[in-house]
Every structure is written in C-alpha cells, then in structure tokens.
C-alpha cells in the first residue's frame, strides 16, 4: 500500500537524470542526450512536472508543450499538448496521473490556452482508458505512411 500521495512539482535542470530514467518507462528506446533534456527544461514553450514520493523518489512525469500549429481535433491555437505522461506501475491507480494532469492543465491555462490535447499509439488501450478517465475525448485515429525516395540523379 502506498503511504502518502506524492508531491507534484515542476522539474528543474537538476531533475534531468531522474526525468530521463522515468522517460524510459514510457519510451524504452529513448536515447535523448542528458544535455539536450536539461536544456529543454529551460524552454518557456514547455514544462515537465514530476511526482515525487515522500522518500524523494520520482514516480511519474508529465511533459507539456505549446503547439502553435494545427493539432488534430482542436479548435484553437495555441494548444497545450501532453507530449508524455507516465506513472510507475506500482503507483498507477493511486491518483498520481490525475495530479500530474492537474498541474499540466494549470500550466496550459496560464499559458493562455483553451484546449489541452494528447495522443497515444492506436494499440495502447491502457493509455486510451487513462485519457478518457481524466476527461479527454477521442477526436480521430490516424495511420501514418511513408515513402522512401531515391536520390535524384
């Protein structure tokens, strides 16, 4: 049983290593250089929020960015975009994800946005359920295609 709810706070450059480790839980193949992640924490167009347990362990994160281009299913600009949202498995279902999302919502509102958007992989039904449980509505499903081009002679 989890003793007490974690504290939610905005990440600082000193948190980059802990954040990078948590990101591997969501994106196992992520290989973003630590220096790049550290620099991104100073970008006013985005924010990272961490959930920290009483013992100081980081147990979840949420990344949000402002998007000024069109975001599928939205009606305004800019839009806050939830780029990543992850809670360690043993903390899932304890309210940590909702608390992280509340911090993202507040940041997004303070940035002048009227909408918060997100995405997930089509097959990730657990993420779909988490989004719906927190008030997101599905807007559309998209399949991306690519075509390799041969260099011109």
From Swiss-Prot:
Sequence positions that bind substrate: 27, 70, 83, 119, 140
Pfam families xref list: Acetyltransf_1
Reaction catalyzed: kanamycin B + acetyl-CoA = N(6')-acetylkanamycin B + CoA + H(+)
Alphabetized InterPro entries for the sequence: Acyl_CoA_acyltransferase (IPR016181), Aminoglycoside_N6-AcTrfrase (IPR024170), Bact_Acetyltransf (IPR050832), GNAT_dom (IPR000182)
Domain of life according to the entry: Bacteria
Ranges where the N-acetyltransferase domain occurs: 6-153
GO MF annotation, one: aminoglycoside 6'-N-acetyltransferase activity
Keywords for the protein's UniProt record, in alphabetical order: Acyltransferase, Antibiotic resistance, Transferase
Record GO biological process: response to antibiotic
EC number: 2.3.1.82
Function as written in the Swiss-Prot or TrEMBL entry: Catalyzes the transfer of an acetyl group from acetyl-CoA to the 6'-amino group of aminoglycoside molecules conferring resistance to antibiotics containing the purpurosamine ring including amikacin, gentamicin, kanamycin B, tobramycin, netilmicin, and isepamicin.
Record's subunit section: Homodimer.
Descriptive protein name: Aminoglycoside N(6')-acetyltransferase type 1
Organism: Stenotrophomonas maltophilia
């Amino acid at each position: 049983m989890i003793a007490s709810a974690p504290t939610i706070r905005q990440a600082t450059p000193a948190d980059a290593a802990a954040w990078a480790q948590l990101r591997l839980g969501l994106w196992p193949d992520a290989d973003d250089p630590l220096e790049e992640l550290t620099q991104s924490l100073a970008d006013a167009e985005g924010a990272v929020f961490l959930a920290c347990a009483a013992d100081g362990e980081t147990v979840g994160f949420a990344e949000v960015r402002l998007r000024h281009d069109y975001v599928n299913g939205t009606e305004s600009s800019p839009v806050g975009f939830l780029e990543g949202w992850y809670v360690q498995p043993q903390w899932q279902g304890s309210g940590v994800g909702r608390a992280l999302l509340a911090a993202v919502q507040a940041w997004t509102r303070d940035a002048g946005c009227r909408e918060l958007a997100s995405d997930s992989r089509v097959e990730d039904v657990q993420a779909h359920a988490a989004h719906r449980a927190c008030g997101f509505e599905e807007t559309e499903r998209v399949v991306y295609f690519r075509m390799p081009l041969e260099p011109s002679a």
